[in-house]
Amino acid sequence: KSGNNWYYLDSDGEMAIDTLIEDGDNYYYVDINGVMAANQWVAIENEDAGEDDEPEHYWYYFQANGKALTNGDNDKVSLKTINGKKYAFDEDGKMLFGWVDDDSAERVDDSDGDGFKEGVYYFGGEDDGAMTVGWIQLDITYDEATEDDYKYTAAAFNDDEDQSRWFYFKSNGKKVYAENGDRTKDKTING
């Protein structure tokens, strides 16, 4: 520590700069000046960028103690509130975005455009990540939409696979969908 700032020395005794540091189950980030990030969002380059459904970078939120928020040991989504909005993170501290499965607390692969089928939550785009509540219209690009019998997906699509669809998410962030083999779900919302 120097003044109000914390720094990290690597195994060679050199000050670490512009890097994510893993210390046991905790993750920290030091900036280009070696100062530990605290109470802030940081975008860190994704080494797997360019592969299927992989973003250019991942967002992390570092708390006052410098530790990245994570999902911890939870198997299910554990929501974290930051500046009045709810977010979810994986076990490594990466902010989840897009369609997210409740049971595994992981992003649903949406590279084929069918993430809406398994996704329970929707956390916006890769640079947003805030949990969706209420109505949202999303563009769906799913090549097999008109032939898919999963929960009657085909019944909701016409000849054009590239369509916009409305989804409704309850106050807990979970998607409302038809259950028990029903083709549709009638739900009174706000009235």
Spans of features found by a protein language model:
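Extracellular adhesion/carbohydrate-binding repeat motifs centered on closely spaced tryptophans
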Residues: 1-191
